[in-house]
Amino acid sequence: MGAFGWEQDRGAPFSGRSPRILTRMTDAPRPTAGADAPARPPAAPLVAPNFITEIIERDLEAGKYPRVVTRFPPDPSGYAHLGHVFASLLDFNTARQYGGQFNLRMDDTNPELARQEYVDSIADDLKWLGLDWGEHFYYASDYFDRYYAYAEQLIRQGDAYVESVSPEELSRLRGNATTPGTPSPYRDRSVEENLDLLRRMKAGEFADGEHVLRAKIDLTAPNMKLRDPVLYRIVNKPHFRTSDEWHIYPAYDFEHPLQDAIEGVTHSMCSLEFVDNRAIYDWLMEKLNFDPRPHQYEFGRRGLEYTITSKRKLRELVQAGRVSGWDDPRMPTLRAQRRLGVTPEAVRAFAAQIGVSRTNRTVDIAVYENAVRDDLNHRAPRVMAVLDPVKVTLTNLDGEKTLSLPYWPHDVVRDSPDGLVGMPGGGRVAPEEAVRDVPLTRELYIERDDFSPAPPKGFKRLTPGGTVRLRGAGIIRADDFGTDEAGQVTHIRATLLGEDAKAAGVIHWVSAERALPAEFRLYDRLFRVPHPEGENADVEDDSAGPAEHEAEPGAGQETAPVSQGFMRYLTPDSLRVLRGYVEPSVAGDPADTRYQFERQGYFWRDPVELERVDSREDALVFGRIITLKDTWGKQGGGTQQKAEGKKRPSTKGRGPDEVRGEGSSSPAKAHAPKAQPLTPEQDAEFTRLLGLGASEGDARTIARDPALLAFVGGAAPGDTFAQVASWTVNELVAGLRAGEVKVRAADLAPLAEGVASGQLSARIAREALARAAASGDAPLTIIEREGLNAGLSAEALQQVVAQVIAANPDKAEAYRGGKTALLGFFTGQVMRATAGKADPQALAAALKDALA
């Protein structure tokens, strides 16, 4: 196949059609039965502790910034895809966690490929995902004038020059890893000549590639990025927003840091392939004297198996007709996933299971698919549909019966937090009221493969003379059957037996007389190998480009020919179309209802087909969102890899997330032998822990360790479980293995609730947890007894504020002189002096009054 308090539509029909087209973030709450289930508060923290949050907390404590500002900067040359989910949610959640600001920026610096349709679709898809940037929506093109002014400033400072050699010569002059770069004849042009040439470049006097503007840094630098990188290039193409006003466009390494500084971004997060580019970022911040200045931080990139996210390759799939468009449900674009029927809650739940580290990692696509299944299990009412029908005549049934069958199985009813379940048309009712009428008639349809004239051993469905139970309707016996000339079964004659009859199997069915005809589109993974553009791909296939920007943006990479070697790994039957029947109860349901067709999978009506002008109300087209179970597990996890004949590199002595070591830009392989595989018992526990809300990493660690598993067995299920699991793995693990932890897991849920509600800080929670582990007292009892979370009176707070200001007169004077960023410094000092007991809002008001 192809989390926080969200206020989202419940999967409204897809409307924005394209033209043929980890830190563990907060664990998304499991949806309760039905789409109108009551919302649950989010678990906390929004972003679990990691190296970036540690930096942010140090910066805030030191008063480096008044508040956190992050940004997500997609390149509008294609549609948002699953590869953007982790990074965008990390940026958004981080800003929210620290009460900061999140910016959405369109990096529209490539006039050849940037389009308004891509801007609109990206913004629409990110809103669907749950991101909210308010008024902070920006285009890089809004600041072309300012970029240009900075370019002239660099020239006047002697820090930039116009280069006039050919692109090939420029590449040669840069040298390589063992040879330093060589100055070109134009490196020492005068300021006047450089300014004249840059202005003429801007005016459009020169052809593409005739000149570029380069930074003058260090041609001998070991970091090749510092060898006089290109800042501006000539592109004589109209821009979708500025038309033909500009003939030069900034390179990514120039635009990115400048735009961060202009927007007031504090912590600029990007993936690991930009680690060397940070040197240019820092050089520009120093040369242009931004204060306070932003800083760039790199995290390990997250890839997804059985998927490609290169926009060039996705575009090639569309152009080659291998998919129907950018919204083809087999594509990894968010637009396609929306059409497929995946909900934003499922995508966020997937992102919640991915951790932030400094190591690249490829995520098993089963993690994503299981998040989709878990979401739909509690969202999709059960009905019956027959996709490949064969007719059955019940010879002893004279009239029609109306059966009342439940929408929900017992496990969904059991897990409902309010004891109610949803109805397809909306609203929540008692489980016994959540039923639909299903007609039982003389003629039925069953699945063709549910009847076998010559059954193999172990076949438990219908056979000649054998019995089977019809779901909710009773037991039938096959008396005889007919075939066509090819030997294919055309009809079955059967008898409806009494309830005292016995049958080994259960099958689904629909009334042949009353069921609705429908088309069923069965989508599967687009690629048949885990790494279609990596270890499985042709050696000449390029797969090194960053997620958002190539090494030299706008230098032709996006328009260069793409190796089609990856296409050899397309799944031949990733789309199968069948025509069958669905029970008539669906006729009155909202078009966006997601169903579980029993024994078949999760489906919904294709929203694009609903929009077609020539569609009729009775022309039902259902697309399969996901199968009920992972049908790829064996072939993808074992057999497939052996067939490819690839040997895995040794990882002896390395940690589970460090196949190439922290900070390496080389990706860790998803199936590299990081540890022994889970035993069947451990795998069952792993699955159970995931279902309870634990992150993938925490669940795997706990499932392997009897001491940890025994401890969390006493934890209460619910929204706090993920935090309890995280504390178990990260705070209590050593003590549990040594048998020294005295606190009960059941006592941790109230502590987690306190953190989630904001009543307790993470620091106080960890301190109380450590004391509880040693004493056995409940953490909240310790907090109350020892006053760890006791607030300050207004008078006491004012006294501390006055003392801090008196101890820092120079900073107080600077603040009053306009350096308002120092408010963060004073906040940190007061928090330190009060051991974190000051209420943040009261503190902010007290500081502003005292510094006025």
Swiss-Prot record:
Gene Ontology molecular function terms on file: ATP binding; carbon-nitrogen ligase activity, with glutamine as amido-N-donor; glutamine-tRNA ligase activity; tRNA binding
Residues annotated as binding L-glutamine: 107, 252
Chain segments carrying region Glutaminyl-tRNA synthetase: 1-635
SMART domains: GatB_Yqey
The protein's enzyme class: ligase
GO cellular component: cytosol
Catalytic activity, reaction form: tRNA(Gln) + L-glutamine + ATP = L-glutaminyl-tRNA(Gln) + AMP + diphosphate
Enzyme Commission identifier(s): 6.1.1.18
Domain of life: Bacteria
Segments of this protein annotated with the region Disordered: 1-42, 533-562, 632-681
UniProt feature, compositional bias: Low complexity: 28-38, 664-675
Biological-process GO terms, alphabetical: glutaminyl-tRNA aminoacylation; glutamyl-tRNA aminoacylation
Keywords, sorted A to Z: Aminoacyl-tRNA synthetase, ATP-binding, Cytoplasm, Ligase, Nucleotide-binding, Protein biosynthesis
Motif 'HIGH' region in this chain: 74-84
Subcellular location per the Swiss-Prot or TrEMBL entry: Cytoplasm
InterPro entries according to UniProt: Asn/Gln_amidotransferase (IPR018027), Asn/Gln_tRNA_amidoTrase-B-like (IPR003789), GatB_Yqey_C_2 (IPR023168), Gln-tRNA-synth (IPR004514), Gln/Glu-tRNA_Ligase (IPR050132), Gln_tRNA_ligase_bac (IPR022861), Glu/Gln-tRNA-synth (IPR000924), Glu/Gln-tRNA-synth_Ib_cat-dom (IPR020058)
Residue ranges annotated as motif 'KMSKS' region: 308-312
Protein family according to the UniProt entry: In the N-terminal section; belongs to the class-I aminoacyl-tRNA synthetase family.
PANTHER family: GLUTAMATE--TRNA LIGASE (PTHR43097:SF5), GLUTAMINE-TRNA LIGASE (PTHR43097)
Assembly mode: Monomer.
Protein name: Glutamine--tRNA ligase
